[in-house]
Amino acid sequence: PIPRMGGLAIFFGFILSALIFVPLSTPVRGMLLGGVIIVILGIFDDIYALPALPKFFVQIAAALVAVLMGNQIDILSNPNIFSSEPYWVLGIWSIPISVLWIVGITNAVNLIDGLDGLACGVSTISSMTMLVIALTVAEPEVALLMAALSGGCIGFLPYNLNPAKIFM
């Protein structure tokens, strides 16, 4: 059998880099704490094969921690070329949409983890893309977090490619 919990290797590399190099502002602490909750959930799920509903509620709680500590989507750009409004200000919808987004991304990555290297490869591409965007718009904290995440994924990827020696 192939060992599981390889995500711990990514997470430990990520969290260590984040704690050393990233200033621990309230939003960063929220992201890290939400991530710790998700990692603990993943450990329990790997060991006990938890039912979907309790996992979903824990994911919502983890997302709420991150969102309520300042990580929320306040404005969306409007792709409708026929609208005079280039942006949508979310107002009171900011928190539920942000939670929905985080839970959705969490589950999307979990769902694509069925093929060797797929989730890790997609996460590497995504985090490197966000790294470049963060550098472009002068968001150094986000850039450092994305550098740490992409580094963890790149370090794990050779062990997760077909034939996988460990699963995320």
Features from the language model and the residues they span:
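"…together with the soluble PPM/PP2C metallo-phosphatase catalytic core" -> "…together
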Residues: 1-168
